[in-house]
């Protein structure tokens, strides 16, 4: 999810920014889709000029006008100076100061793409997605306009990357709880007051998760191996049957094939 990718980018920035890539070696031909055949050739010898994030994708820009775009999928993570290289380490990078980075992805649902930097904004996956939830672009007014007349559940629309970029299941559950919105409610029926609360809750939840290093569920760890600790402060996610704090009990339903955690007593 977005906080995990942001945490990853910040960790990589400390090691990669300004460094020359002495070698870049893909160790297989594909992940979720094919890895560009010329990726190693185009990146070897390049200097990293910046790192960033768009939605759930990480971006590594170079002085050759190329940008490496990575997606971690379900189980991907970058490792810095790994003690051993195994079968799940699918891309190796060695920098000019002797650091080694590996992209490790046991389930291979991630991806690696190499784009011309001046064409990144026009890449089809980026053209189709909505604004970033951090930075103030997503307001109650914005949500009201996007939700107008929609009968789909508000939770499902928040997961639609065309409306807001980068939101995933965990943080949508948490934001809806903070805004006291029932995830089953038709999006077009949510009041303007509650949409204002939701627009404030989304960045608050994400900022807190980034500050805590993300949520270490299953496979995620930052590049330096540190685990994220936001999961220890979840209000509802993964807490089915536990008390809410409002005298209610956290429940679980399935929406769109994913678990939704919420408190039926205080989320209306």
Region spans (language model):
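Basic, nucleic-acid-binding surfaces and adjacent catalytic neighborhoods in DNA/RNA-processing proteins
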Residues: 20-38, 52, 63, 80, ...
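Generic detection of long, well-ordered alpha-helical segments
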Residues: 2, 133, 137, 191-199
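Phosphate/anion-contacting hairpin/loop surfaces
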Residues: 68-166, 171-178
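Short, contiguous clusters of charged residues that form electrostatic/catalytic patches at enzyme active sites
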Residues: 3, 7-10, 141, 145, ...
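Surface-exposed binding/hinge segments that line
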Residues: 1-111
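Glycine-centered flexibility motif
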Residues: 34, 45, 55, 76, ...
């Amino acid at each position: 999810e977005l906080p995990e990718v942001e945490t990853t980018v910040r960790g990589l920035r400390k090691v990669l920014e300004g460094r020359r890539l002495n070698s870049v070696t893909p160790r297989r031909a594909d992940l979720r889709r094919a890895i560009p055949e010329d990726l190693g050739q185009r990146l070897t010898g390049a200097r990293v000029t910046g790192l960033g994030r768009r939605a759930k994708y990480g971006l590594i820009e170079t002085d050759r006008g190329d940008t490496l775009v990575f997606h971690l999928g379900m189980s991907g993570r970058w490792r810095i100076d790994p003690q051993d290289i195994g079968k799940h380490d699918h891309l190796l990078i060695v920098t000019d100061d002797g650091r080694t980075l590996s992209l490790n992805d046991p389930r291979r649902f991630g991806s690696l793409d190499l784009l011309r930097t001046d064409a990144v904004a026009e890449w089809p996956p980026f053209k189709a997605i909505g604004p970033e939830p951090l930075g103030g672009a997503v307001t109650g007014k914005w949500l009201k306009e996007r939700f107008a007349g929609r009968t789909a559940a508000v939770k499902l629309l928040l997961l639609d990357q065309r409306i807001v970029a980068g939101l995933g299941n965990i943080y949508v559950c948490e934001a809806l709880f903070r805004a006291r919105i029932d995830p089953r409610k038709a999006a077009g029926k949510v009041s303007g007051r509650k949409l204002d609360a939701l627009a404030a809750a989304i960045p608050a939840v994400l900022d807190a998760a980034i500050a805590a290093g993300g949520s270490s569920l299953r496979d995620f760890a930052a590049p330096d191996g540190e685990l994220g600790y936001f999961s220890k402060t979840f209000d509802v996610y993964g807490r089915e049957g536990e008390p809410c704090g409002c005298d209610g009990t956290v429940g679980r339903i399935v929406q769109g094939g994913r678990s939704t955690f919420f408190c039926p007593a205080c989320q209306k």
